[in-house]
Amino acid sequence: MKEFPKNYNFTENEKKWQQIWQEKQIYAYNPNAAKEETYVIDTPPPTVSGQLHIGHVYSYTQTDFIVRFQRMMGKNIFYPMGFDDNGLPTERLVEKQKQIKAYNMDRSEFIKICEEVVESEEEKFRSLFNQIALSVDWSLEYQTISPLSRKISQMSFLDLVQKEEIYRTNQPILWDPVDGTALAQADIEDKEKTSFMNYITFKTEQGDPLTIATTRPELLPACVAVFYHPDDGRYKHLAGKSAITPLFNEQVPLLTDPLVRQDKGTGLVMCCTFGDQTDITWWKTHNLPLKTIITKKGTIDFQHETSIDGLKIKEARTKIIDILKEQELLIKQEDITHTVKCAERSGAPLEILTVPQWFVKTISHKEELLKRANELNWHPKHMKIRLENWINAISWDWCISRQRYFGVPFPVWYSKRVGEEGKILYADVTQLPIDPLKDLPMGYSKEEVEPDYDVMDTWATSSVSPQLSTHGISDDFAVNKDRHDKLFPMDLRPQAHEIIRTWAFYTILKAHLHQNTLPWKNIMVSGWCLAEDRSKMSKSKGNVLVPEKLLEQYGSDVIRYWSANSKLGADTAYSEDVMKNGKRLVNKLWNAAKFVFIHFDKLKGEDKKASLLDIKEKITNEFDKWMVNKLVELVKLATNELQNYEYANAMHLTEKFFWVVLCDNYLEISKTRSYDEEHKNPQGQYSSILTLYHVMQTLLKLFAPFMPHITEELYQILYSENSIHVKGSWVNYSDLNYEINAKGAEGLLEILDIVRKFKAEKNLSIKTPIKLLEVSGIVLSAELTEDLKNVTSAEEIQFEMKDDKIKVNIIL
């Protein structure tokens, strides 16, 4: 008989098993397995944009719980890992890390530096993901900037061009003056900012004063009209007249529109090109002229005696207000707090500029997308409303152009040939991936074309993350159509709730447009990991937790235990107490396994190899049968919870069974029989050891998705040299049940609880002998009575049926 190791060293064992799993390819995907046997995950490719934090561990391990369960259930798992390593987030990381600015450098040199940085950063992710035991198949790894990903992303673009779902136009777009790029609606956030409502004097062309309230007086040079509500009786006399702008003396029409709020300001609103989306609506609806005064750098471009040319927006606002005051054209100012649209990443207030951009048709598909949201299986269900709210709020088509550098280029040129100047030239699919700055369209020379200098929004590539793994976009555009057809649509998209409006939405949109389908059957939405005081983690607060330190202190299994204690979709605070509970659980598992291990040499070899169903008749003791029935019930419940993506419920059920049913009760109650030092009851001894053997084996499998290292170590010591994590290793006891009256075993537990409380109240050892237990309300069988005697140290037990309520009298 082999020896049980004295101690469990999580540092050594976790490294050992991670290496063995890789070497033995325990998590390898089998491309030859049937489609119906395969379970496919659209793993979130982490953005290569900065420091790793505990939030990465939190969300990725929750996905891994489900993946490991599905593998153990017999599924052929396709579990890739990608890296979202292109676009603005990565550029900002590189600029910060290297103290450089992309616009001050040669484009190719900046891209080269980006490539070097992401390679280094991605290695950190790989190391962390291996340490936390993500059961990914690393041979399926992809990068969103790799040649293959660029090819598939450009295929997506060409497919949507072919389907007339993409267009290019010169229209107002949201512009980030700090990062110098157009943004999509999903890239912005509303921020509360303090400002002034400025009441300014305009005049009619007849010289009558008009008071207009505005927060943006610097846009006066771009004023193209003044509006009032058609039902506003105060201004009906202005119909058909014009207004004269202060300082700039431009004549603009006075018009009516129902979008004007009569209760805001004075009810007179100036329309400028452009201050907000309402300005755009009025500009289009009323066919107004375009006056552009704001540059891409967020400065004023307007030659005038006010000398605001070249000033930044805030500087120009201050100067205009000062001049208005000097000329007594500023009537008053009111302090206000209002919502300002800002760039999500740079934090800069956005401007609206008119720049040629590529757009994906979105608004026209809103109703179809709402139906898609309803077809999808949401886990948890309430997260669906977030997508529905976002779809209903969409008011812009998706702008996918970015005026940046490190991204997927548009496979596009513009002709300079005589007679076709400006004609859009698209790359042939056989040319992909292409860089229009280096490559040429078929049949054209360098002198005959102008490349598209923009790159795609990083979401334009991330939104085809399923297809980056399946290697296809549609029937017409695929690198490997057989692979794509086998893997798409996928089974699961795991992701965080804050990117439902971006990653989930865009991926659903793309799959709908490309193949008229959903990209996956299920979406599993995780919450945020918060600091211990339930505040959001941030570097400025100094409360960001670094995974490496926690791994060093507690090990991977304990951190995964903490993650498993959080309900799916819930925001959860980091908790030292939960970590300590996880550490206790690992230690208790080790000690419980050590206890049962010493008895296993008493079992016959064939009984160790047989299933619990096959040796059912050899478990003869009544309490053992009750224990097995409880185990079968646990397996059914935990399996059902995991099938419904409720990993936290499965973990809670399993842990509670382990601590209460097994450790607190069964081990203590069956201990005397398991040892049977006087050889009084060999059949009862064999029954208890066989029960322990299978209960422990089953619990290790139920814990395995959550704590893979300790369960693997114990499984190999106690049971098999094969991995506990291999395909098909889950337990199925659907046909197993002992026909017994559970009231007997449950009555034993109730009596035991009364005795334990009695001894605890009197500060007596649990082993303190009892002369007589007088029990009323139940009569136990001889087997249960013997077990009760052993566990309570009672010399004699007398039963009497007075009523159904159990009462115990203890005589020491």
UniProtKB/Swiss-Prot annotation:
Enzyme's top EC category: ligase
The record's GO CC annotations read: cytosol
The protein's matches in CDD domains, at most eight in alphabetical order, are given as:
Anticodon_Ia_Val
Q: EC number(s) of the enzyme? A: 6.1.1.9
* Matches recorded under InterPro entries: aa-tRNA-synth_I_CS (IPR001412), aa-tRNA-synth_Ia (IPR002300), Anticodon_Ia_Val (IPR033705), M/V/L/I-tRNA-synth_anticd-bd (IPR013155), Rossmann-like_a/b/a_fold (IPR014729), tRNAsynth_Ia_anticodon-bd (IPR009080), Val/Leu/Ile-tRNA-synth_edit (IPR009008), Valine-tRNA_ligase_type_2 (IPR022874)
Q: What's in the keyword line of the UniProt record?
A: Aminoacyl-tRNA synthetase, ATP-binding, Cytoplasm, Ligase, Nucleotide-binding, Protein biosynthesis
Q: Does the keyword Amino-acid biosynthesis apply?
A: no
Q: Tell me what reaction this enzyme catalyses.
A: tRNA(Val) + L-valine + ATP = L-valyl-tRNA(Val) + AMP + diphosphate
- UniProt short sequence motif 'HIGH' region, positions renumbered to this chain: 46-56
- Predominant subcellular localization, coarse grouping: cytoplasm
Q: Which Cys pairs does UniProt list as disulfide-bonded? A: none
Residue spans crossing the bilayer: none
Quote the subcellular location field of this record: Cytoplasm
Q: Alphabetically, which GO biological process terms does the record hold?
A: valyl-tRNA aminoacylation
Motif 'KMSKS' region boundaries = 536-540
Query: Where along the chain is ATP bound?
Result: K539
Taxonomically, the superkingdom here is Bacteria
The GO molecular function terms of this record are:
aminoacyl-tRNA deacylase activity; ATP binding; valine-tRNA ligase activity
Binding partners and assembly: Monomer.
Q: Which family does it belong to?
A: Belongs to the class-I aminoacyl-tRNA synthetase family. ValS type 2 subfamily.
**Which PANTHER family does its entry note?**
VALINE--TRNA LIGASE, CHLOROPLASTIC_MITOCHONDRIAL 2 (PTHR11946:SF93), VALYL-TRNA SYNTHETASES (PTHR11946)
Function, in words: Catalyzes the attachment of valine to tRNA(Val). As ValRS can inadvertently accommodate and process structurally similar amino acids such as threonine, to avoid such errors, it has a 'posttransfer' editing activity that hydrolyzes mischarged Thr-tRNA(Val) in a tRNA-dependent manner.
Q: What the record says about its domains?
A: ValRS has two distinct active sites: one for aminoacylation and one for editing. The misactivated threonine is translocated from the active site to the editing site.
What name goes with this protein? Valine--tRNA ligase
